[in-house]
Curated annotation (Swiss-Prot):
Enzyme category, top tier: transferase
Lineage of the organism: Bacteria, Pseudomonadati, Pseudomonadota, Gammaproteobacteria, Lysobacterales
GO MF term list: 3-deoxy-manno-octulosonate cytidylyltransferase activity
EC number: 2.7.7.38
Catalytic reactions on record: 3-deoxy-alpha-D-manno-oct-2-ulosonate + CTP = CMP-3-deoxy-beta-D-manno-octulosonate + diphosphate
Stored HAMAP family: KdsB
UniProt name for this protein: 3-deoxy-manno-octulosonate cytidylyltransferase
Family: Belongs to the KdsB family.
Swiss-Prot/TrEMBL keywords: Cytoplasm, Lipopolysaccharide biosynthesis, Nucleotidyltransferase, Transferase
Length: 259
């Protein structure tokens, strides 16, 4: 396979009905269809060989089981993370260990197809156990917001660390002002899309959480603390924000309604 050969991949979408800030989030309507349907359409547009929604809720399953090209994996209700849910989905789907699985969040109705393909291609050609995407931080609010995860990476593009803190910490600039992004350096925010082989997904789900994951509440740190590589590429086009709150939902509805 040459470096220009597009990756063959499947997309798995974890979808939970319960949401503290936006109950029933996957079924909230954006335009004429539920949010989860928009997400499956983005995955199909990206060229995924298979698209699966992993859920433990019959209402979500009923909303999408009729969609062409979309499969439903009814998973257990006790999963503590989306990774655990996707590991069960992979077993239900019967994917072999080498299958490239893209983990696309169920609240990303506007995820660009190019970005979905990019993370699959990155896994294919990087040799890392996982791949993910990042985007430049262009404002101080995001840089200092703990809900916006930042990352640093090696010169070769592998993740060095993910944090809710602003990393790298610009000692001189931040000592005097924190209302802008320093001109010197590169600040990246993490985009929560992942690719991994189905076999590594099972290994990941079986690992116990590490100290760093528990402190930062960032699941990907489990992989790094265990010594595995995560390749990171800057997204080829912007990822619009996901839907987390009622205000986010209103903005998404306005976006779809706009001519």
């Amino acid at each position: 396979m040459t470096p220009t050969t597009p990756a063959d991949f499947v997309v798995a979408i974890p979808a939970r009905y319960a949401s503290t800030r936006l109950p029933g989030k996957p079924l909230q309507r954006i335009g004429d269809r539920p949010m989860i349907q928009h997400v499956t359409e983005r995955a199909l547009l990206a060229g995924a060989r298979e698209v699966w929604v992993a859920t433990d809720d019959a209402r979500i399953a009923a909303a999408i089981e009729h969609l062409p090209g979309v499969h439903v994996a009814m998973t257990g209700a006790a999963h503590l993370s989306g990774t655990d849910r996707l590991a069960e989905c992979a077993r239900i789907a019967g994917w072999d260990d080498q299958t490239c699985v893209v983990n696309l969040q169920g609240d990303e109705p506007f995820a660009p197809a190019a970005g979905i393909r990019a993370v699959a291609d990155l896994l294919q050609h990087s040799g890392a156990q996982m791949a993910t995407l990042a985007a430049p931080v262009d404002n101080a609010h995001d840089l200092f917001d703990p809900n916006v995860v930042k990352l640093v990476r090696t010169a070769g593009g592998d993740a060095l660390y993910f944090s809710r803190a602003p990393i790298p910490w610009h000692r001189d600039s931040f000592a005097s002002q924190r209302d802008s992004v320093p001109a010197e350096g590169q600040w990246l925010r993490h985009i929560g899309i992942y690719a991994y082989r189905a076999g590594f997904l099972q290994r990941f789900a079986a690992m116990p959480p590490g100290m760093l994951e528990r402190i930062e509440s960032l699941e990907q740190l489990r992989v790094m603390e265990a010594g595995y590589r995560i390749a990171v590429a800057v997204t080829p086009e912007p990822f619009p924000p996901g839907i987390d709150t009622p205000d986010d939902l209103v903005r998404a509805q306005v976006r779809v309604a706009s001519p």
